[in-house]
Design a protein with these regions (language model features):
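A beta-strand edge to alpha-helix "cap/lid" segment located at domain peripheries
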Residues: 51-131
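Short acidic-aromatic low-complexity motifs
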Residues: 2-27, 131
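Short, flexible active-site loop motifs that bind/organize anionic cofactors or intermediates
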Residues: 11, 36, 104
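Alpha-helix N-cap/loop-to-helix boundary motif
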Residues: 1, 13, 38-42
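A solvent-exposed, acidic/Ser-Thr-rich amphipathic alpha-helical stretch
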Residues: 18-71
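Exposed alpha-helical structural elements
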Residues: 4, 8, 20, 45, ...
Length: 131
């Protein structure tokens, strides 16, 4: 199951679409952000965060550098550069027996990257509300 989700996730990252993302998320998915204090619960809000992150990382040479999968979990380390700032992070993705994502946790370093992502994600989320 992990390999299927991993392949779907990579296909989504290569050609992001709301439809593809929606098909991977459990209705009660939880999104845990490095820049929001409380976990965000539910498919609509998780989609909003992940789609906004996709916009933030557009044209950043985002790439996964390491991937580990075991027992209903994918852990994928990533790197990117935004506005000349290096970003290193980890996506920790839990999934159920149907292959649907039940929790998506993002961890990011260094602190300058966290601060920049907080600003850029805020801008994207505001733009999404206005649209």
């Amino acid at each position: 199951m992990a390999h299927e989700l991993q392949a779907k996730w990579h296909a989504y990252m290569d050609a992001p679409s709301a439809e593809a993302l929606s098909g991977m998320l459990h209705e009660d998915v939880t999104f845990i952000s490095p820049v929001v204090f409380t976990p965000q619960r539910g498919k609509p809000v998780t989609m909003q965060y992940l789609l906004s992150a996709g916009h933030v990382f557009t044209d950043t040479q985002f790439r996964y550098t390491k991937e580990i999968e075991a027992d209903g979990r994918l852990v994928m380390e990533f790197e990117a550069e935004i506005d000349g700032k290096y970003i290193n992070g980890v996506d920790i993705i839990d999934f159920d027996e149907d292959g649907l994502i039940t929790q998506f946790k993002v961890m990011v370093r260094p602190l300058q990257a966290v601060n920049m992502l907080w600003q850029k994600m805020g801008e994207q989320l505001e733009a999404a509300k206005s649209a």
